């Protein structure tokens, strides 16, 4: 077992959608003005479509290892109290605010981590093989209508 320091972020979010790309700047400006006037939590209550909006957008403590690369690159250089620009998440946009940062010492069971990674990789490969097999069956199947 190894000991490792883990960086944790206390995050809050505002998740919003737009009708079309032209509305992005307008919506972003409205949200930023609201954050400046009434604060991030109240703005999350108003604008966020996420369930976390009921709690002022607060997500809780999140390990940097649990963040996607896209999100990590956006928040990595921010200081406590700062927020990201809107991050495109496909169907919606995400604004994250760092409320606090802390480091925790964590004991790492190397065997367990290796076992988890092997299991994840095996599952990924099985999914890939099953898709390939399904596509072959789909190609070779003829459906005759009456």
How would you describe each model-predicted region?
Residues 1-35, 46-69, 95-125:
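Well-structured core secondary-structure elements of compact alpha/beta domains
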Residues 40-45:
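Short, well-structured alpha-helical segments that form the helix of a local strand-helix-strand
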Residues 135-145:
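Short, low-complexity, Pro/Ser/Thr/Gly-rich segments in the mature regions of secreted, periplasmic
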Residues 83-89:
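Short acidic-hydrophobic surface loop/beta-edge motif
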Residues 74-76, 81-83:
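Glycine-centered loop/turn motifs
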